[in-house]
């Protein structure tokens, strides 16, 4: 049997972390078994579904490289198929027309609730022989079995059973002729030959209804697996304040897709004590029986730790392709300065996100208008004039511009003046970067370049002279 899974989001908003994890688990299961992964857009909610949301979902999937083998399919383009199946069910007696008014249904609901009963349709039209005009408004209901129970072996939670007496005859076609969500899902899974349905636990109550419809259609019933919800680290339902933002927001905030995927796969699944997984390892090791039944806690600090790891572990040339977007957002012209891959090597240890990296690299490519006030006050003082002049001349004398030779020039300056490295290094750092912090000074000066570094040292010396004149 060929394994076939699907990810079926409703395009009423962005792709959030919960949806992304469900997509990842479905994708991994299919890939682990050499199967196929289908993308289906469940857009039957015409009022809330938007083209922007569809684009956002597909952007998120593409950024995470969760490529699909079929689709995207759109439910709104399959209404003829759904209605044909409903008409077939009406002929076979597994569905029936219901003419009950909204007023009657509301009164029935209030009566049942007053008695402490679960609100459900009482089946009045199921056995009715009343004659109705062809154009009289009606819905179509599924004739749910009235005896027995529905049992399915959830691959994460184990056997789950529902009594058919708890399930009423759900509406499968509205008065306007449009099919309902639960019915469309069934026909889609049937037509697309889905073998395994991996989805959130909020769909558990839909499962017995969908199984009963499949059985009425004499269609194969897929295997179900319901993934637990994601909470914040405070144990409460995940919300925006916990980080429940769109997948693309993580891109915008400077996270690598590898970091988010690694974090999401571990958010409810484990393989021994292993924390870091390549995409190939995820595919190799992923199984549904290793997915936890318990809710997971989203921890932004852990995600940030993973992102920092991947910034330094992945090839700099690859990280640079993602950094490029953030550089563009900062409007930095990188034509005159180090290659982005070299920048990744320079700033990788200091920066935990690509956004942070982009925001802290401008001095490598563009001259700064002024020095950081605190750093200049502390380090660009008259006592720094001589160390800066000496190191400038030694840097100017370098014929082979390497980080090693830059280091020798700084060290030689300290030795010649008989001062500690800090007496040379700190004024030099402020002079060439404009700030009091940077990566290792020798590689920083090397990356900034010989001509630009000397020009900036001269600018710092002029700043010191002007400061002296003002005193």
Swiss-Prot record:
Disulfide bonds: none annotated. GO terms for cellular component: cytosol. ATP binds at residue 240. Its cofactor is Zn(2+). A motif ('KMSKS' region) lies at residues 237-241. Keywords: Aminoacyl-tRNA synthetase, ATP-binding, Cytoplasm, Ligase, Metal-binding, Nucleotide-binding, Protein biosynthesis, Zinc. Catalyzes the attachment of glutamate to tRNA(Glu) in a two-step reaction: glutamate is first activated by ATP to form Glu-AMP and then transferred to the acceptor end of tRNA(Glu). Monomer. This is Glutamate--tRNA ligase. It comes from Escherichia coli O157:H7.
């Amino acid at each position: 049997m060929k394994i076939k899974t699907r990810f079926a989001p409703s395009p009423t908003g962005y792709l959030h972390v919960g949806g992304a994890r469900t997509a990842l688990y479905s994708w991994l299961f299919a890939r682990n078994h050499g199967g196929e992964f289908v993308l289906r857009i469940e857009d039957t909610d015409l009022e809330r579904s938007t083209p922007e949301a569809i684009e956002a979902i597909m952007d998120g999937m593409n950024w995470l490289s969760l490529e699909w083998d079929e689709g995207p399919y759109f439910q709104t383009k399959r209404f003829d198929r759904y209605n044909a199946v409903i008409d077939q069910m009406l002929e076979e007696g597994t569905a029936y027309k219901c003419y009950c008014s909204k007023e009657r249904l509301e009164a029935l609901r209030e009566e049942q609730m007053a008695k402490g009963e679960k609100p459900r349709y009482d089946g009045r039209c199921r056995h009715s022989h009343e004659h109705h005009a062809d154009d009289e408004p009606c819905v179509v209901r599924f004739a749910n079995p009235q005896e027995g129970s529905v049992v399915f072996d959830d691959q994460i939670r184990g056997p789950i059973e529902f009594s058919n007496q708890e399930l009423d005859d759900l509406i499968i076609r509205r008065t306007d002729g449009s099919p309902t969500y639960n019915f469309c899902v069934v026909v889609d899974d049937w037509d697309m030959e889905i073998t395994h349905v991996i989805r959130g636990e909020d769909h558990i109550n839909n499962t017995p209804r969908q199984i009963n419809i499949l059985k009425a259609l004499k269609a194969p019933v897929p295997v179900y697996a319901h993934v637990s919800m994601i909470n914040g680290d405070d144990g409460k339902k995940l919300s925006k304040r916990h980080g429940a933002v769109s997948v693309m927001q993580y891109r915008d905030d400077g996270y690598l897709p590898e970091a988010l995927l690694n974090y999401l796969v571990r958010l409810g699944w484990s393989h021994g004590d292993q924390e870091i997984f390549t995409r190939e390892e995820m595919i190799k090791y992923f199984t549904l029986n290793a997915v936890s039944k318990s809710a997971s806690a989203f921890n932004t600090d852990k995600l940030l730790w993973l992102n920092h790891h991947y910034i330094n572990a992945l090839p700099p040339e690859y990280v640079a392709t993602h950094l490029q977007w953030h550089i563009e957002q900062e409007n930095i012209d990188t034509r005159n300065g180090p290659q982005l891959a070299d920048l990744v090597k320079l700033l990788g240890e200091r920066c935990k996100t690509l956004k942070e990296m982009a925001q802290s690299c401008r001095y490598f490519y563009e001259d700064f208008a002024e020095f950081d006030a605190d750093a200049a006050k502390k380090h660009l003082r008259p006592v720094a004039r001589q160390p800066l002049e000496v190191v400038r001349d030694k840097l100017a004398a370098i014929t082979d511009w390497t980080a090693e030779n830059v280091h020798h020039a700084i060290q030689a300056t300290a030795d010649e003046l008989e001062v500690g490295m800090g007496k040379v290094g700190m004024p030099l750092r402020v002079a060439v970067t404009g700030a009091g912090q940077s990566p290792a000074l020798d590689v920083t000066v090397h990356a900034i370049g010989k001509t630009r570094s000397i020009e900036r040292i001269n600018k710092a010396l002029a700043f010191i002279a002007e400061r002296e004149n003002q005193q």
